[in-house]
């Protein structure tokens, strides 16, 4: 259905919590595949396709600017723009997830999707702010504060992305397209276990 691609793309986004943007273009490919497959389910998944495409495109200059030593200051702004695009993708994907879980009657997953949207808002706002602030000239004391805040945001990011991956896995396990016919369960080779 597309939730498998979504799960792979979500797992590839884990390194962005520590500022490692090199996996974002690869994750964007999987997220685009998921958005394309899930676009027929509801509109927010269609929007997530375009946002994943934009995130993949924005990640390339962020990577290039990070590699070139003279442009390290500009890399923070490119990474901030990439984070905002990934944030918008998360909002669209989680909205689509909330809609589809409501339609299928999965009340707990519906509540989890809305809870994850709130956590994503908090995490990505802090991460984008700290990514841009990291490139600014600050005093030594402010630099120590930003370093400590970065560690807290990294921990929060790992929790948020793990919660989103869990939600995606649960949706993958519980939701299928209406035209999909459930396959009959194959006979067990160990009949004595079922008896």
Regions of interest found by a model, annotated:
Residues 25-28, 58-62, 80-96, 157-161:
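Generic alpha-helical transmembrane segments
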Residues 98-129, 171-193:
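Membrane-helix boundary/juxtamembrane motif in polytopic membrane proteins
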Residues 72-83, 143-153:
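Non-cytosolic membrane-interface motifs at loop->transmembrane helix junctions
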Residues 63-74, 130-142:
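Juxtamembrane "helix-exit" motif on the non-cytosolic side of transmembrane helices
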Residues 36-49, 70-73, 101-112:
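Membrane-interface helix-boundary motifs at transmembrane edges
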Residues 85-94, 112-135, 150-160:
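Hydrophobic alpha-helical membrane segments
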Residues 1-4, 41-53, 113-119:
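Membrane-interfacial loop-to-transmembrane alpha-helix junctions, especially the N-terminal start
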Residues 1-37:
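N-terminal topogenic module of multi-pass integral membrane proteins
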